Amino acid sequence: MDTRAKDPASRPRLLVAASGTGGHIFPALAVAEQLPDWQIEWLGVPDRMEGKLVRERYPLHRVVMSGWQGSPLHRLQALAQLARATLQVRRLLMSGRFDIVLTTGGYIAAPAILAARSLGVPVLLHESNWIPGKVTRWLGRFCQVVALGMAETAEHLPGVAAQVVGTPVRAEFYTPQPFPADLPIPDGDPLIVVMGGSQGARGLNRMVATCAPAWLEAGAWIVHLTGGSEAQDPEARIPSHPRYRPFPFRRDVAALLQRANFAISRAGAMSLAELLTTATPAILIPYPFAAEDHQYQNALAFVGRGGGVVMRESEENLDLLRQTVLTWLAQPQVVAQMAARLQAAAPPNASKVLARLLQEIRQSSAR
C-alpha cells in the first residue's frame, strides 16, 4: 500500500526544520514524540547538535545555512546560501510529498518557510522567546499559525496569526521521575541544580564556583550541569566536596528539577519551560551575548510569574548571588510560595497542543 501523504488514508508526512541549539531542537522533538503515527523527517544544518540528537530517530536532511550577523559580505553570502537552501528544500518537499512543515525558528526556518510557501505547503512556526527572532518577524506572516511560548511575544508580531501554547518539553517533565541512584542525596537535604544550557555557560559557572563554598557550608547539595565545553575551565573549578556534583551533561534533568529546592540557570526559553513545568523557582543569570538580549527578556517573563529573580552576569553581582541563595536556603517557606505560583502559572502540555494544531492545519489544508 502506498503510504504517501496525498492518499487521505495514509500516514501524514511532516518535515521538521529545527537546528543548532537545544532550545530549537528539544521542543521539536517533544512535539514529534506526540505523533507516533506520522512519517517524520528532519531538516538541519551540517555539524550541529541535531546530528547527534536526531539522526537515530528520524531521517535527517541537511542544507548549508548561517546567520545574518556580520559584515556586508557575510550577509551577501548568507543570502546566497538562503537561495540555494530554499531550492534544495523545495525539491525535498516535492519529492517527499510532505503535508506540513513544523519549524522552531532560527535561520534554518527561513528556507523551510519560503520553500513551503512557494509550494502551498502549510507551515506551523513555534517561537519560544519573548522577543521573536528575525526569521519569525520577517516570515511569520507566511505561516498558517505562529505558536507562542509566551503571551508577551504577540505584541511584537502585528498582523500574524498567533496563538499562545507554551513551549514544549519532553514527556518525562510531566510525570514524576525516579531520582537517579548515583546521587545519594538524603531526603530533606536542600538541592540546588545549576544549569548552563545546552552550550555551557562559562560566566555563570565561574560565578557559581566563587559562591558555592558558602552554600556547601550551609548544608546544600549542588548538582552542576557545566556544559561539555566548560567542564575543563580552570577558573570554574570548585574544590572537591562530597555534596558538589559536577557533570557536563545529564539526561535526567526532569528528575533533578522535580527534586530540587531551586535552580540557578541561564534564561533560554527551553530551560525556562522546564523550570515552569516542574514548578522550580530559579535565580536566572541570562547569557549576556544572546541576540537582542532575548534571554534577559525571557527572564523577566519568568520572574513576572512569581518564580524567582534575575541578575546580570557580573563580578559585581557575586555577593548578590551568594546572599540570595543563602537567604533561600534559610527561608524554604518563601521558596515554596514561589513554587506554588509557578505551578499555578504553568500552561497545558504544549507538545500535545502543537500536535493537535498540526493535525488541524493538515486537515483544513487537505479540504
UniProtKB/Swiss-Prot annotation:
It comes from Synechococcus sp. (strain JA-2-3B'a(2-13)). It is found in: Cell inner membrane. It is a peripheral membrane protein. NCBIfam families: murG. This is UDP-N-acetylglucosamine--N-acetylmuramyl-(pentapeptide) pyrophosphoryl-undecaprenol N-acetylglucosamine transferase. Belongs to the glycosyltransferase 28 family. MurG subfamily. GO terms for biological process: carbohydrate metabolic process; cell division; cell wall organization; lipid glycosylation; peptidoglycan biosynthetic process; regulation of cell shape. Cell wall formation. Catalyzes the transfer of a GlcNAc subunit on undecaprenyl-pyrophosphoryl-MurNAc-pentapeptide (lipid intermediate I) to form undecaprenyl-pyrophosphoryl-MurNAc-(pentapeptide)GlcNAc (lipid intermediate II).
